[in-house]
Amino acid sequence: MRKILTFAPILCFCLIQCLNKSESRFPVDLVLELKNAKSKFKIGTDNRTYHWKKNPGRQSGLPLSRKWENTQITFNTNKEIFLNHSLDAIYFPPGQEYQFTLPKGKYKFSSLVGLLGEKEFQPSVSGKLKLYTQSQILEEWDFTGAAKEQWNKKETLVTLEGDLRLVWESKDSDLYIGEPLLYPWEWLDTLVSAQKPKSVILIVIDSARKDFIGAYGFRHSVTPNIDQMAKESVFFENPFANGNWTKPSMMSFFHSEYSSNLGLGNSWFSTKPYQRKVYYGKKRDNLAKTFREAGYYSKTIMNNVFFLDYTTVGLDLGFHNSYQVGMDIVDTEILTNHAIEFVTEKKDIPYFLHFNLNTPHASYSPPPEDMKVVRSIIPDSEFFRYESPVQRYLGEMHYTDREIGRLVRKLKELGTYDETMIIVTGDHGELFSPEHDYSYHFIMQTRFGHGETHYDEEINVPYFIKLPKSIVYNIGKNSQIRISGQSSLLSLAPTILGFLDLLPKNSTYQGVDYASCIRNSTPCPKETYIYTEGRMSESVRTENYKYIRRYPGFTTVRRTSAGEPHTMAEELYDLKQDPKELRNLSLGTEGEILLQQARADFRNENFLKRNGLRIWIPPCEETVCRDFMSMSVQGSVYDWVAPPTVQIASGSAKTISVTKESKDRKGSNASSQEPKQDLSEEIILRTVNPELGAFFQFTRNGKTIPVRFGKYGLEFQKSMTHIEDLIVSERQPDGLYASPLPWVYNDGAFSGSGESEVQKEMGKEVKKILETWGYIHE
């Protein structure tokens, strides 16, 4: 059997996958088994608020009454480099026990264990962790005198008789068992005796422009290691990010869905409570979660905080282990060293590693030795044509490539390179052209930065996939496989999972699975429209044109930060005639036909899901009615639909004013019978942010009048600022068009009302009560 496996890599891979599927889950991830385990104490609240670097685990499926039993907790294990080491852990307050029902057999128990005191300034921590099966003690670890906020590796071999009980004996100390995994001995033996497992490394280079990489046509060999790997890969010739800065881009390619459609918006760093509610409240497939559920060990090594939930910036995607270095400049070598340690330690098991290097990102501070190499590669006559920041950027790209080369050499030394899938991409590019220097509203200037524009130099990134040799052999390709035409990073997750036969059925991944067409030697689908989000802006790119749109309230731009402001709500570029995007055709009549086509394509594709604030303005019952309404939303205004009789002006990203003048309409709707829907009296204000609440004030002929809200038409004399629970109605409220007062409701088309069937039934009773109290007037 071992000889067959040695010479049959495809058979071996299938066997490993079959073992994973037939034996419940191998390795056994105790965090994911928590929901079926018995716990001595249910822990539904945060017992240690003084240690704020933590959050309840988001992937274990625990009920609210037990949610803190799984804690994603971070220890600052090296304060000099701001090293935040976060693990998905099982939480043990003093005296806590957990009992798991598991298949009988021999296992390797593996974990990282950390301690905290019950009190913040407690001088010492201590306790004993005991492992039992059927009342028989398997292992005991004494933590007397252990250091706080440090991770300690604990492994042991155990033979289970159908259960595993973990007992924490302590008077005043908390225990966190991070990444607790049980590896079946037979499964490990299969991996050792057969070929190396197929592991996956996703290398994300922050701010990597495609056109500064040799594989994409840069004339000088600044990135030799990346270029060599590209020759062995599925190579996307013209790939684009779906976000022009890190957060919306990485969230989109990890989930194969646009950031705003995940509930996260695109405007700023923070992730607000309601955005978290929408994100965590729906089924969300992502790379870390899918690999973990398939039995892979999952880790991120990075210098950004977007995968750390406690920061209020990031989210918990379900990694076993997150290693984040916050110190800039020195971080790259530290992260690479840790990645080398990781691939060495985990060489015998399948893993998914997200390796994120921040190096090319500003402030462009390459080591002198890398600048020296770049100077030797590029002739002076060409090198000095670049401005100083671009020269340093080239040094950073060489430094990044050098570090990636170190990791690749270690994989080859370990004998794991051939069967490791390696993906190289960038989260976005970087803007260098002075012609594109528009500064808008945020903390960084546009030039030598990103996040403000949608020109190709800011969103055109490298993207290629080095396949395991056994997969290459299976599909009969021995050289680079090129994907022509434009593509997007929305395809990244379904494509790499497709090659590994791990794409879940009925998944939420939206992008193209290129693995299918490559394996079947059929023409690959064309990504006709590529949509990209920016801060309060968006774009759609085809092979022929680029259309850019800014949200209302964000249409004023400046040429350089000190320049004169001017309005530029739209941009349009003919990419066939103007590939450098220098002539904005939206400003004159020359591009009118193309502009109408681009707008229509943009509307018809419906890239984003949106909530609709629906506003009913009642008919005028006086000789003349001058209606005015001021309104602000918690997120940002995306667009609106209004009849010609209504004038709308935006005061900022979050506020608009509505003005309507009408003459007497007495008799037109005088019947007690409710008329058909009259769109001429309805305004729809759309938002992509998931927050439902808003602020309104309505006057008719200078007099403030009450407004009705939500499904019940609750009437308020004064404007309100927090009406989330009252304003939502997933259908048109009863009596809307017969109302003599303005009526506002949020259709929750994106966020949803979040009501259960029980809550809906309760709502009927609430409506009756409110009617008897006089709050609802049909």
Where are these regions (language model features)?
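Non-catalytic, glycine-rich low-complexity segments
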Residues: 83-94
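Generic recognition of well-ordered secondary-structure surfaces with a strong bias
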Residues: 1-2, 111
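Hydrophobic core
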Residues: 13-17
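Catalytic domains that recognize anionic headgroups
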Residues: 18-77, 92-103, 107-110, 114-128, ...
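Signature aromatic-anchored transmembrane alpha helix within multi-pass, membrane-resident enzymes
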Residues: 10-11, 496
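Sec-dependent signal peptide recognition
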Residues: 2-10
